[in-house]
């Protein structure tokens, strides 16, 4: 058996790369692209300080609190009201600048090397006692990205491979994951010929390749079947083994032999210790694509009807934000009708007064009903187009609301009265009163719905009880008279 062929670590894409990336690569540097939003600076700092971009909002708020504490130091760099500047900085639609970068360097006790296009970088020393260094790339548009050395890329590729393999081996319990990754990414490995290593019972335990690589074969007791019908799997069902011919071939090996892939190539690249993928960027782009396609609110400033957010009612008190549910959005997206949870009423507010909830309070929408097949396949990382063929049609107006009630949802019982019905006056025959139907205060009020309004009774019930029904978008009201026995139930509107 020959020696193992060594592979060099590489990034995900090698073709059609940016000239700036090639310039940095020749100098043993790698630029990790960030999502093009206003939180790019805080994503970069969160990744290099906390090893994850998911804490970018917490890093933003730590920066705001630090600048508020050291206001004597940073106020002279801000033109205008400093408190208003910090208030806007706390919102995710406000981009960070060099001023915030300097504040976070003092906060986390780090100096920084700032790279620009076709520049080797300049060292900015905030304090000689700071031992650690941030490597940040900044373009002319004020967008920030992470710069890594090739040694960091090699280490990150190994850590990424270990994380994905733990997920697919120990959580999903797929058989022969290493073999599948090699089969999908390096098919030439198996063209030179293979051999099997057997144990004392005659079972194949390892696959040996001519280039020196070997792959441990899993046993059916510790894995689950990949086939749709596990009863037809000869690996996990020994009674179907045809004279031992396919007994040692796992369902993973059977799929590969039939030119079927068990998971996507992106997942296979993530499990390769010689490749580094920008998983955060691809995941964020995929999440935004699905949100645009299915009309899903993901907790940003692209609000949808039914989304829970925060509203600023008093322009003089920006620190007071009330929780609300968006009921409707006009076509120009300048005014929104919201239901104030604290006050229990509907209010028309400008769209600029709405702000998303903090990430720790935001609850993602459950849109499994809109793409059940796609959600099931994404759990296993498979590439399938079955979800797109289930009748899902992309929303032609993604800015409008999805046809679903806002969360949380009670048990709404709306009653519609047609506007063409002529007014009815005078007493009618007696009928047994029913339980009054109260409109749900959180529901989206549509044209034609009405609200029961009745004056409270002070004394004994009169001979005739009048109930007024206010019909929206109609020039009249309906008055119904009922007999006094039994007395009609009282009903008060929450509006």
UniProtKB/Swiss-Prot annotation:
Residues 302-364 form the Tudor domain. It comes from Drosophila melanogaster. Residues 375-389 have a biased composition (Polar residues). This is OTU domain-containing protein CG3251. Gene3D superfamilies: 3.90.70.80. One of its GO terms (biological process) is apoptotic process. Pfam families: OTU (PF02338). InterPro entries: OTU_dom, OTU_OTU, OTU_Tudor, Papain-like_cys_pep_sf, Peptidase_C85-like. Keywords: Apoptosis. CDD domains: OTU_ALG13-like, Tudor_TDRD13-like. One of its GO terms (molecular function) is K63-linked deubiquitinase activity. The keyword Ribonucleoprotein does not apply. Putative OTU-type deubiquitinase. Catalytically inactive towards all diubiquitin molecules and long K48- and K63- linked ubiquitin chains in vitro. Potential modulator of apoptosis. It comes from the Eukaryota.
């Amino acid at each position: 058996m020959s020696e193992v062929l060594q592979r060099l670590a590489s990034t995900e894409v090698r073709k059609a790369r940016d000239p700036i990336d090639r310039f940095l690569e020749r100098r043993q540097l790698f630029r990790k692209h960030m999502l093009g939003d206003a939180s790019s600076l805080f994503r970069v700092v969160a990744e290099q300080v906390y090893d994850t971009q998911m804490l970018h909002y917490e890093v933003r708020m730590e920066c705001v609190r630090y600048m508020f504490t050291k206001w004597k130091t940073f106020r002279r760099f801000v033109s205008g009201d400093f408190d208003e500047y910090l208030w806007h900085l706390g919102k995710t639609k406000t981009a960070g600048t060099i001023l915030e970068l300097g504040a976070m360097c003092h906060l986390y006790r780090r100096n920084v090397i700032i790279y620009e296009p076709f520049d080797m970088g300049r060292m900015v020393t905030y304090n000689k006692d700071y031992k650690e260094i941030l490597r940040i790339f900044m373009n002319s548009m004020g967008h920030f990205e992470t710069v890594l050395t090739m040694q960091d890329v090699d280490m990150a590729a190994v850590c990424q491979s270990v994380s994905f393999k733990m997920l697919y081996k120990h959580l999903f319990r797929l058989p022969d994951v290493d073999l599948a990754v090699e089969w999908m990414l390096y098919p030439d490995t198996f063209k030179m010929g293979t051999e099997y290593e057997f144990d004392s019972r005659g079972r194949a335990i390892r696959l040996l390749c001519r280039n020196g690589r070997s792959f441990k074969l899993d046993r059916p007791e510790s894995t689950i079947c990949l086939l749709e019908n596990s009863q037809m799997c000869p690996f996990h069902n020994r009674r179907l083994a045809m004279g031992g011919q396919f007994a040692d071939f796992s369902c993973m090996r059977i799929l590969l032999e039939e030119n079927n892939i068990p998971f996507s190539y992106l997942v296979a690249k993530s499990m390769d210790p010689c490749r580094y993928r920008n998983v955060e960027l691809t995941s964020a782009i995929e999440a935004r694509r699905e949100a645009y396609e299915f009309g899903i609110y993901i907790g940003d400033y692209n609000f949808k009807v039914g989304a829970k957010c925060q509203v600023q009612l008093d322009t003089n008190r920006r620190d007071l934000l009330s929780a609300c549910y968006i009921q409707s959005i006009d076509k120009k997206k300048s005014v929104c009708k919201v239901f104030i949870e604290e006050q229990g009423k509907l209010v028309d507010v400008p769209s600029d007064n709405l702000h998303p909830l903090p990430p720790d309070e935001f609850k993602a929408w459950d849109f499994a009903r809109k793409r059940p097949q796609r959600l099931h396949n994404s759990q296993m990382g498979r590439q399938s187009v079955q979800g797109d063929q289930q009748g899902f049609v992309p929303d032609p107006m993604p800015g409008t609301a999805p046809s679903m009630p806002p969360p949380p949802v009670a048990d709404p019982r709306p009653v519609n009265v047609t506007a063409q019905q002529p007014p009815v006056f005078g007493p009618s025959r007696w009928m047994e009163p029913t339980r009054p139907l109260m409109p749900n205060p959180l529901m989206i009020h549509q044209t034609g719905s009405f609200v029961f309004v009745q004056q409270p009774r002070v004394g004994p019930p009169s001979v005739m009880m009048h109930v007024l029904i206010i019909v929206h978008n109609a020039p009249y009201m309906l008055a119904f008279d009922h007999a006094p026995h039994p007395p009609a139930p009282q009903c008060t509107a929450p509006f």
